[in-house]
A protein has these predicted regions:
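ATP-dependent helicase/translocase motor core
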Residues: 1-128, 135-150, 168-172, 190-192, ...
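Conserved helicase ATPase motor motifs in RecA-like P-loop NTPase domains
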Residues: 101, 201-202, 215-232
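Conserved helicase motor
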Residues: 131-134, 154-163, 177-182, 346-348
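Residues immediately C-terminal
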Residues: 136, 179, 199-203, 229-230, ...
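Conserved motor-coupling elements within RecA-like helicase/translocase cores
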Residues: 158-173, 186-187
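SF2 helicase catalytic motif II
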Residues: 188-220
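Interdomain helical connector at the RecA1-RecA2 junction of SF1/SF2 helicase-like NTPases
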Residues: 234-338, 355-356
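Conserved helicase motor "Helicase C" RecA-like lobe of SF1/SF2 P-loop NTPases
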Residues: 348-357
């Protein structure tokens, strides 16, 4: 049994589950015996219910130009409140929200932004939402505009961002990371400046991310992503994860959570053309036999060349066979249903190969 919530007159398929994460026996969840009474008690507690009504309910416009009431999902409620509480405490200056794609991170930022703007003890803060693509900028701006969030501005160019920061504007600012290109250190040293970075696994370890941090040395920095990276040259956990947070993140909503809540469709993988898969074990054996009589230096050079899997992936024979299989599969299973399909290739050259084939 599960508890679902939704606004009045919302079709049942758009209702979402309300859960208490990490507050019950996981076996009970698996068996479908979770404590619905406990969830109802939590949801209808005056502090929770009033919080949702005041900060986590918005009116938006649907595709038919009709006003609809939108109520938060539980992961948006928990994630946004985690950000708000961290800012109010003021001790930890960053945090990572790791929520799977399609789980509603744009609305999470909206809920967090409007709640922080209304907290008197935060002293009229500035909330910045930073994206790294024009389409994301337009998408998030449209989300805020549709919900008629007050005191929200966007930046059309670098100068506008500079003016907003230098004049100490106290609003919700939506901007792109690229507009920090010409900022200078200590551009705004205020403490109650909160930055939420969408798709936080990109651009943050490079020059633009460093420029932003240098320009806003005392700001709170929160990263939101569905795919954090943990590599030497790119590390989302280093950029946003706080040492105090378990596993480096302050809130997580996984792919499995999203499937369970019907927020995301399941992903099915069908292996095809096994003769064209990479047999690493036999490849390693063949390489050792071939390299036996080579010097160490020549062996290293050969290894570097052999490691370039693109040579194999882009061989004309392989591309031709795969394209033939794609066309047959598309015409038989995809096109009759009126759907489209996408081909993912190793690089641009391969993309041209597949298109021409």
């Amino acid at each position: 049994k599960e508890l679902f919530i939704g606004s009045v007159r919302t079709p049942l398929e758009y209702w979402s589950p309300w859960r208490l994460e990490d507050k019950g026996d996981e076996l009970l969840h698996i068996a479908g015996l979770q404590d619905v009474a406990g969830q109802i008690t939590h949801l209808l507690t005056p502090s929770t219910l009033l919080d949702i009504l005041q900060y986590f309910t918005i009116y938006a416009t649907n595709s038919k130009k009709k006003k609809i009431k939108v109520v938060c999902r539980y992961q948006q409620y928990e994630g946004a409140n985690a950000i708000v509480e961290r800012v109010k405490e003021g001790k930890i200056k960053k945090g990572l929200i790791w929520h799977f794609q399609g789980s509603g991170k744009s609305l999470l930022m909206l809920f967090a932004a409007q709640k922080m703007r209304k907290q008197q003890d935060l002293g009229n803060p500035t909330v910045m939402i930073v994206v790294d693509r024009v389409d994301l900028d337009s998408q998030i701006t449209a989300t805020f505009n549709t919900a008629e969030v007050p005191n929200m501005v966007t930046t059309d160019n670098i100068k506008e961002l500079h003016d907003l920061l230098e004049k100490d504007t106290r609003k919700i600012i939506i901007t792109m990371i690229h507009k920090f290109k010409d900022t200078y250190p200590d551009m705004n040293k205020r403490e109650n400046l909160i930055v939420m970075v969408d798709e936080a696994h990109r651009t943050q370890e490079g020059d633009l991310g460093q420029k932003m941090r240098s320009a806003l040395p005392n700001a709170f920095l929160f990263g939101l992503t569905g795919t954090p990276i943990n590599k030497a040259d790119k590390n989302t956990f280093w950029a946003f994860g706080a040492e105090e947070d378990k596993s480096g993140y302050m809130s997580r909503y996984t792919f499995q959570d999203s499937i369970r809540d019907n927020a995301t469709l399941p992903l099915h993988f069908e292996p095809r053309l096994p003769d064209y898969h990479i047999d690493r074990e036999n490849l390693d054996i063949a390489f050792k036999e071939m390299a036996n009589d080579l010097t160490e230096e020549d062996r290293n050079k050969l290894s570097q060349k052999a490691a370039k899997m693109a040579v194999f992936l882009k061989s004309p024979e392989r591309v031709k066979t795969i394209v033939k299989d794609i066309v047959e599969h598309f015409q038989k299973h995809v096109e009759p249903e009126g759907f489209k399909a996408m081909i993912v290739t190793p690089d641009r050259y391969a993309c041209v190969q597949y298109k021409e084939e």
